[in-house]
Amino acid sequence: MSSDNNDNNNNHSYKEANYYNYYRLLENNLKKKSRGLFLTENNKKKSKVFKLTKFSIDTEINDCSSTSKWTQIYSNDSKTPIEARYKIPLHPTWIITDFRVESQDKVVVLIGKIKEHEKALNNYNDTIANGGQSFLASKSSIEDLDFFNLNIGNLPPNETVKITLTITSEIGTHINGQLHYYLHHSLFPTYNFNFNLNIIIKLSNSIESIINWYGNSKRILNINSSNTGCGSDDGDDDVIKVLYNNSNNKEIKIKSNDKLNSIEDSLVLIIQPSIINDEPKSMIEYNKIENSLAVSINYYSSFKDIKIEDMNQKSEFIFLIDCSGSMVGEPMRKVKRAMEIIIRSLNENQHRVNVVCFGSSFKKVFKVSRDYNDETLECLSKYIQSIEANLGGTELLTPIKNILSSPPNPEYPRQLFILTDGEAPHRDKIIHYLSKESNTTRIFTYGIGDSVDIDLIIGLSNACKGHYEFITDNDNFEKQVMKLLNISLKPMFSNIKLDLSTLFSNNKNKNKNNNNCKEDIIIQSPSQIRPLFYQERMIVYLMIESLSTRLKDIINDSIENSKPLIITMTCDGPKGDKLSIPIELDLKNNCIISSSSSSSSSSSSSSSSSSSSSSSSSSSSSSTTTATTNQNQIHRLSAYHQIKDLEEKERKKKKDNKTRIVELSKKYGILSKHTSFIVKCESTKPTLESMDFIDIIDQFSFENQVSATKNKSQCLLTKSKKSKTAAPTTTTTTTITKKRFSDVDEDISRQSVKKSKKSETKEETTKTTSSKTKSSSSFDLIDLLRIQRANGSWTKSTISQMGISIGNAPVELSSDQLYNIWVTLIVISKIIKLFPNEKIEYEFAIQKSKKWVKLELSKLNLPNTTFDKFSLKANSLC
């Protein structure tokens, strides 16, 4: 998200959220905005006799997920049987967990069965060929975007059919702990139909506010009226109305306007909890029939009471710089200056760093990121000064793949900064690739100039849950660059692991059979936990598919005696310390006990319509302190993330995990890329008439990538284009010595780094002009930062060369060994006094310096007030 767009009241701020990236790609790639049951040209006449007539959505939202029941009624008013096919977008977090079909006479409800896709498709075709009815629900991908496909086979004339889907999803999250519920307009037909939306929000904390967006219309819902009739003051034309809220605002019911007969725009609810719990929360499901346990853990930390000077967290910083021909001149000069400031804002013994330049090819300074120290800093500084815009075009995917091919180090969370001024081929392919890497890398992007591809910059950062900036004003270049660095240096938890050994250590039978229940296989998903960055939410699932006798005893004892079980989250904290955070599993008051089979909804069966249960209703459970969920919801979310892990292993290691994916899909009734829901309705009176075929499967046709990226309405800030060819240069040579920097990339160390005389002259001219505006100083801020050491200090020898008067040091610092402490205090004061308007540029470098001074003073056993006393003296001399 943009660092400028963190205000809740910003227009369409929900589009900055990471979950929205899927819809951005969808909108950018759709050839036309057709969706749902919008028919192709050949079938427009048939659309009058076959259509969706009713569509209702019943949703329940809790602290971390939502469950929705979609009920759709289709009508065939023609004189012939119909076979219809259509598709709707399927967000990556959506899980189709139930598929039911109800006939017109309402005698039976047919429940879909999960089968491998090929077998399900054969069953579908065979049933139709024999004159019966069949319904097929499947998942597909187009241009790396997932879709849900529904085939309605052999619907007799003058009949209706009701189709019900259950969709489980993690709730969308955004800044300040917001929860977002989003319905994109492409989910709905373009014609009128009867629409009904009912939402129940049940949170563990009270709700402060709910904002409703419908297209460009924004409205703050009235949730603080009397317990009933909260929407009585709402206008007749409002899309959403509040029906009910309880006294503590933890439960709120919302419904759509009864007059709503179409959905022309996207609809979003932004739910703001009043309190953000600064501790992990758990939700538990205990399935007695399946003998299984599933746990979801969600954690949003405010990182309160963390002072900047106390922070000592580790991170890896990689800077990927566009050196294509269009960056020649002022853009490259600005990038180089910004990079000089950035590399001096990092910290010794905390950070690792690397710089990669890309164009038609790419070059890395180091083969792998190096520890940040004086040698690394010197090498990077020389290299940055030598960078030119001479690498041709903008081939971004290759260097990104190279960077991400290195396994992430959990102790050094990887943060990638991309600086570019143009477009990149295969934009959506790059974004899709990065979306698979969000657990390994966080990405920050800078769009430089007026011709940058907006969707590339936003898409790259959102794919890996990062932030972005557009830089069109050269005067604020460095300030905007430093904004994102500021975010990257905020507190976080890294190297997160769940210690489950404590799960068995606080029960009365702990001395019996003391093997920590080794027979209990506990599956964590996702298997790799993303660092918990500032203003992010962590959600992790645990599942035990078959409980041992001992663990069942532990669970029952916990329930009977109100004795919570404990698991421990270990991590590296912002202060550089190892943290152990207990997580309570309160099975007495916060556990849903299920008595149904996980796979019951995916078995082929029929039941009376009266026995059809609503997915949005609460399952039977003991009294809970958090919102209840539907039966086996946490089991299914856990299984879904296991499937995602297996698919990722297939992608990276070329390993075939189809068998296990199909097994999980069948057991938990989850639609996957290898499976489909199939419903067959064998008829005693087979339909022998020929069917009319309504082919609406190709409605989501895509432009090719080249035309998509060139579409000015989607990509560009202006119509202007910059050349992507390398600018001709006259060169001089600066050599990086391989002997000293033995791990410098061979391509860099072999070559002579060329520097353009033309660029050099322009830089000196600009620098001279700039220096005239400085407050009576004969040097620029960057001149002082260039001679700063990696630990934040300055030395007497380097400062003397610049003609800076140091004055007499305090007696305590007058020895040669301590004199650099005084020198550093003098330079800090000089910078603050001479460059008051550039604070954001030097802020981190000065913080580093102050931290070093305080550390050195602490070794001398001087009073706590010594730093302030010496700083005042230094200020008086400047």
Swiss-Prot record:
Region span, Disordered: 595-638, 752-774
Annotated InterPro entries: VIT, VWF_A, vWFA_dom_sf
UniProt biased composition (Low complexity): 595-623
All copies of domain VIT, residue ranges: 36-169
Matching SMART domains: VIT, VWA
Database matches in Pfam families: VIT (PF08487), VWA_3 (PF13768)
Polar residues bias: start-end ranges: 624-635
Residue intervals of the VWFA domain: 316-496
Name of protein: von Willebrand factor A domain-containing protein DDB_G0267758
